[in-house]
């Protein structure tokens, strides 16, 4: 998986690129939270749930069903708070949440992503894995491998995100 901070890159770059008239700050904040939400499944380790279990890491919280239903619930509960239209809220939140499993699918480790849950327990990777998988232990980020993880995230997520943000910003000017 990319680091939890890097999962925020997609909604952050899209939201800032489109500007606060299109993506109000509250909606941007919710998008960032939803982009990080699927990794709450690591808490299942504390309860003895195995990594490869459907309720383990990269299981149902990384599924397409989760990525489409959770934003829908958020929109119905908080649409007025987001200060944006129903469809805009749902689209932004869905892209934000879906980006999480897409980024996880291009990492060099793990057991894949449970995109098709509840129809299948099979895990998937994208055809290419370019992002170094992030270690769970914070202490590992000070090692040479941790530095490689940070560099790969900068190169494959943050740099393209910043370019997209710049193009969106330039287009609206």
Swiss-Prot record:
Q: Where in the cell is it found?
A: Cell inner membrane
Judging by the UniProt lineage, the source's domain of life is Bacteria
Q: Give residue ranges on the Periplasmic side.
A: 36-54, 104-147
Q: How does it sit in the membrane?
A: Multi-pass membrane protein
Give the GO cellular component terms, alphabetically.
Answer: plasma membrane
Spans traversing the lipid bilayer: 13-35, 55-77, 84-103, 148-170
Keywords of the record: Cell inner membrane, Cell membrane, Membrane, Transmembrane, Transmembrane helix
Q: Which residues form a coiled coil?
A: none
Q: Which residues lie on this side of the membrane: Cytoplasmic?
A: 1-12, 78-83, 171-173
Q: Which PANTHER family match?
A: INNER MEMBRANE PROTEIN YBCI-RELATED
Q: What is this protein called?
A: Inner membrane protein YbcI
Q: Which organism is it from?
A: Escherichia coli (strain K12)
Q: What is the lineage of its organism?
A: Bacteria, Pseudomonadati, Pseudomonadota, Gammaproteobacteria, Enterobacterales
């Amino acid at each position: 998986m990319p680091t939890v901070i890097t999962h925020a890159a997609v909604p952050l770059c899209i939201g800032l690129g489109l500007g606060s008239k299109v993506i109000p700050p509250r909606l941007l904040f919710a998008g960032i939270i939803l982009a990080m939400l699927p990794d709450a499944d690591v808490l299942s380790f504390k309860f003895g749930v195995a990594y490869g279990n459907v309720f383990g890491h990269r299981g149902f919280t990384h599924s397409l069903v989760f990525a489409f239903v959770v934003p829908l619930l958020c929109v119905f509960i908080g649409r007025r708070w987001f200060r944006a239209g129903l469809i805009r809220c749902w689209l932004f939140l869905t892209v934000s949440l879906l980006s999480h499993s897409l980024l996880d699918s291009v990492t060099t480790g793990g057991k894949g992503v449970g995109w098709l849950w509840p129809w299948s327990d099979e895990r998937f990777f994208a055809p290419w894995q370019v992002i170094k998988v992030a270690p769970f232990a914070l202490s590992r980020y000070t090692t040479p491998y941790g530095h490689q993880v940070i560099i790969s995230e900068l190169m494959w997520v943050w740099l393209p995100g910043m370019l997209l943000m710049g193009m969106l910003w330039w287009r609206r000017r």
